[in-house]
A protein has these predicted regions:
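Rossmann-like NAD(P)H-binding beta-loop-alpha module
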Residues: 1, 89, 98-143
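Conserved N-terminal glycine-rich FAD pyrophosphate-binding loop of Rossmann-like flavoproteins
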Residues: 1-19, 78-90, 146-160
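Extended interaction regions within the primary functional domain
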Residues: 4-11, 15-16, 53-57, 62, ...
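Short, surface-exposed, polar/charged, turn-prone segments marking secondary-structure boundaries
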Residues: 18-21, 67, 98-102, 110, ...
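FAD-binding core/adjacent interface of flavoenzyme oxidoreductases
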Residues: 24-111, 185-186
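Residue-level marker for well-ordered alpha-helical positions
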Residues: 26, 95, 122-123, 149
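A Rossmann-like FAD-binding core segment of flavoenzymes
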Residues: 27-56, 129-186
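Glycine-rich nucleotide phosphate-binding loop and flanking beta-alpha elements
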Residues: 78, 119-121, 145, 169-170
Length: 186
């Protein structure tokens, strides 16, 4: 996930303030290599055995590894909110939008409604704006913005309206999303 983060992090020096996510990822890979840790990406663990041996599928091949310790880092998965129409083409998660923009240089769409005002929703909304997308609104069921004020302020300064205490009722369209209905929550 760090390799998709083109923005600079903030906070304390120990939390990698003022360093871009992809640079943090590169540094962590170098640290792991220097410590003798073998990092295997895009792999699937097929079996784990009592003697600390694992079998791993990498591409079309099965590999065996044995070590003193096994660390399982499963990665992250998006937590999609489901609603009628959520499977229509054009309804995507923030991570997919970020991958399209930051890794492939592709605009995820022209007019975007962002669901979620946590740091991910705020940062990705700002990245969408920088990419040339129109973020038409930011919607969150919570009564307050969930992310850091600095991220919310950047988005707000662009004129994006925030609909707090609201959620998506349905995505509209037949073969792709053409609109969204939102409603206030209790």
């Amino acid at each position: 996930q760090l390799f998709k983060q083109i923005h600079k992090f903030f906070g304390s020096k120990e939390h990698k303030a003022k360093i871009r996510g992809f640079k943090i990822g590169e540094d962590l890979l170098k640290e792991a290599d220097a410590a003798g840790v073998k990092v295997v990406l895009n792999a699937t663990v097929c079996g784990m055995y009592q003697d600390k041996e694992i079998t791993v599928r990498i591409g079309d091949e099965i590999h065996h590894f044995k070590g003193d310790s096994i660390i399982i880092a499963t990665g992250a998965a998006e937590n999609m909110v489901t609603f009628p129409g959520w499977t229509l083409p054009g309804v995507i998660g923030a991570g997919a939008a970020q991958t399209m923009m930051n890794l492939h240089g592709v605009k995820p769409g022209s007019r975007i409604l962002m669901l979620g005002s946590g740091n991910v929703g705020l940062v990705v909304s700002y990245q969408l704006i920088q990419c040339g997308c129109e973020v038409v609104a930011l919607v969150d069921a919570a009564p307050r913005i969930g992310g850091y004020g600095v991220h919310a302020a950047k988005v707000a300064r662009t004129g994006v309206p925030f609909y707090l205490s609201h959620t998506i009722v349905k995505a509209e369209g037949d073969d792709h999303v053409t609109g969204v209905t939102i409603a206030e929550v209790d």
